[in-house]
Amino acid sequence: PKINVAAEALSQIYLGAEEFPHIVLDNFLDPTMINAAAIDAKWLVNNLETESWRFGATDDHDSQLYKRGIPNIDDMPPAMQLVCLYMNSEPFLEFLRKMSGIEDLMADPTLDGGGFHVTYPGGSLNIHHDFNYKDDLAPERVYRKINLLLYLNEEWDTNWGGNLELWKKDLSAPFKVIELIQNRAVLFNIEGAPHGHPHPLNCSTGENRRSLAFYYYSATPPSNQLYDRAMWLKNGELV
């Protein structure tokens, strides 16, 4: 993307952001690349065999409603595969390292928990803190540091909801609400970074919220607790 020439300048914005390091980048990838991936995303929702999804049916626990995912790159069409391969490539990792200051940042080629995500009408993702370590990505335990979310909806009516909310560390309220715009990327350090889209989607039947998610790791442990699963906001605390 165009941002490759500006890692140092973006680093000041990223590291100096309110509450925790984060940045929103529009026009992130080449338009031809993102348009092809967006077409792939629409095709996947309607054509992929059920057993290829991370959830055999839409997940229906009360913190993650009507959401499905495809973490296996082999189950994705070619244009989406190309995006995933680029996001895990050494040139892109070098950009992330410069922007974040995390020198040993590594990708997860298995896309564990990430990859293609779709949420259907009525669906939501409660405010949560992500799982933050893996034992099977490297010889030693590694720790999740950065999330990158890339939106694939060609047209999204703001009245449908689904905006990403970044919350204050004290869990009192969101401090930033980010609209779904195709080719918009949201990057943030996950430590002390509650987030989600907690309000049910109000989109019409046949519409859905589509995105790609990528997670990046380091050998440096976090200063907060270790979580082997997502921790969900319940009654003012993460459980």
Regions found by a protein language model. Name each.
Residues 11-99:
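Non-heme Fe(II)/2-oxoglutarate
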Residues 24-26, 115-117, 187, 213-216:
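Short beta-strand segments
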Residues 1-18, 229-239:
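Fe(II)/2-oxoglutarate
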Residues 39-42, 72-78, 83-143, 155:
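Non-heme Fe(II) oxygenase catalytic core, chiefly the N-lobe of the double-stranded beta-helix
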Residues 49, 57-70, 99-108, 112, ...:
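A structural signal for the main folded, soluble domain(s) of proteins
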Residues 147-149:
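Eukaryotic charged/polar low-complexity linker/IDR segments
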